[in-house]
Amino acid sequence: MTTETRSLYSQLPAIDRLLHDSSFLSLRDTYGHTRVVELLRQMLDEAREVIRDSQTLPAWCENWAQEVDARLTKEAQSALRPVINLTGTVLHTNLGRALQAEAAVEAVAQAMRSPVTLEYDLDDAGRGHRDRALAQLLCRITGAEDACIVNNNAAAVLLMLAATASGKEVVVSRGELVEIGGAFRIPDVMRQAGCTLHEVGTTNRTHANDYRQAVNENTALLMKVHTSNYSIQGFTKAIDEAELVALGKELDVPVVTDLGSGSLVDLSQYGLPKEPMPQELIAAGVSLVSFSGDKLLGGPQAGIIVGKKEMIARLQSHPLKRALRADKMTLAALEATLRLYLHPEALSEKLPTLRLLTRSAEVIQIQAQRLQAPLAAHYGAEFAVQVMPCLSQIGSGSLPVDRLPSAALTFTPHDGRGSHLESLAARWRELPVPVIGRIYDGRLWLDLRCLEDEQRFLEMLLK
């Protein structure tokens, strides 16, 4: 060991001396004595390694308290951090899909703070059913006879098939054998549920007679799957639920439908493309309809099944139901969200998903123009900051071919180097509330459709 190396090692402080320094008192109060000591030991090991490899001290050795504070602050951040979603995808799966209404947030907080009547009947002091209140709401909204709640729509489809068709065949059009992401495919779900898939028709055309010819003594269900995350266009043919229900009645085979996204309102009244609604399928005579809680419905992640009472009873009594049931927080948020649908006149104001989807391009354009000047002044030395028209997408496999006119702020590096865009995007991801955009066509795009806290956004980007 050289004299210089020995000198560097001697400059490393003792942990006891650091802990008695006044700058460490607040750190010990905030993070605890044990964690601070653990980190100091780790940092001393790091410093010794740097000395050994490069014959120098790490820069942070000049201020140990500051480095400890920075590391522990970062460590204490939640893994689920709030972000500003300016990707242009409203229901972004990686960013948690639907934002919850304030009523849902308050309901969850209340359910977390105190015991609740999850499975307790106040009328007779007996045991209640956790789905009962929600089932009543869902029946009122959809016209169904009963309802069942599980933790997501994939679980809903699994339970629906396992409880009503295990060991038997389920007839599905080949054009509806969807994959919803993460290699989750309808044929795979059927195998897990113990069903046998009976494909009919072709990818682009399926006729009523295809279903008729497929039905045999081992057929349990005729199934429709809404292709919510893709669209087959051109020379196509598919039969709707009403026609399939009529055929099912003739052949004494129930019809079930997986709607996927599942909107409880006619979106066309808000200027959006229309999606099939559970209440329409219930009115058509479909026995069971499954859909998601956290997509177009705008609530928490949940799988909802509505339909005929005797069919729902089979789902409720199946062993999988307990494994897949929703917890009290999910049920609280979903109930509060569904209650908003009882006042449809205020829905676009109180339901964040609908509020964001229905923002007009003109309003977003005005917002973009308002923000452009201060951002151009701040970033203009390196980037051209412009207002550009763009198209938002709904996301989460909803309305896959439909786009919503919007406006974006774009940042284009003067030197054209893509590395500058990556650096800017990385810098914004390190903000107290990370700002998430997307890099495309030599620009960093910030689609403003989902920007509601404009002041906080500006304060962070102008620092």
UniProtKB/Swiss-Prot annotation:
EC number: 2.9.1.1
Catalysed reaction, written as an equation: L-seryl-tRNA(Sec) + selenophosphate + H(+) = L-selenocysteinyl-tRNA(Sec) + phosphate
InterPro entries xref list: PyrdxlP-dep_Trfase (IPR015424), PyrdxlP-dep_Trfase_major (IPR015421), SelA-like (IPR018319), SelA_trans (IPR004534), SelA_trans_N_dom (IPR025862)
Cofactor: pyridoxal 5'-phosphate
Gene Ontology molecular function: L-seryl-tRNA(Sec) selenium transferase activity
Cleavable signal peptide: none
Primary location recorded for the protein, binned into one broad class: cytoplasm
N6-(pyridoxal phosphate)lysine found at: 295
Any GO BP: conversion of seryl-tRNAsec to selenocys-tRNAsec
Record-level GO cellular component terms: cytoplasm
Pathway(s) where this gene product acts: Aminoacyl-tRNA biosynthesis; selenocysteinyl-tRNA(Sec) biosynthesis; selenocysteinyl-tRNA(Sec) from L-seryl-tRNA(Sec) (bacterial route): step 1/1
Keyword Kinase assigned: no
This protein's UniProt keywords: Cytoplasm, Protein biosynthesis, Pyridoxal phosphate, Selenium, Transferase
Oligomer and partners: Homodecamer; pentamer of dimers. Binds only one seryl-tRNA(Sec) per dimer.
Family: Belongs to the SelA family.
Function: Converts seryl-tRNA(Sec) to selenocysteinyl-tRNA(Sec) required for selenoprotein biosynthesis.
HAMAP family: SelA
Name of the protein in question: L-seryl-tRNA(Sec) selenium transferase
Organism per entry: Shigella boydii serotype 4 (strain Sb227)
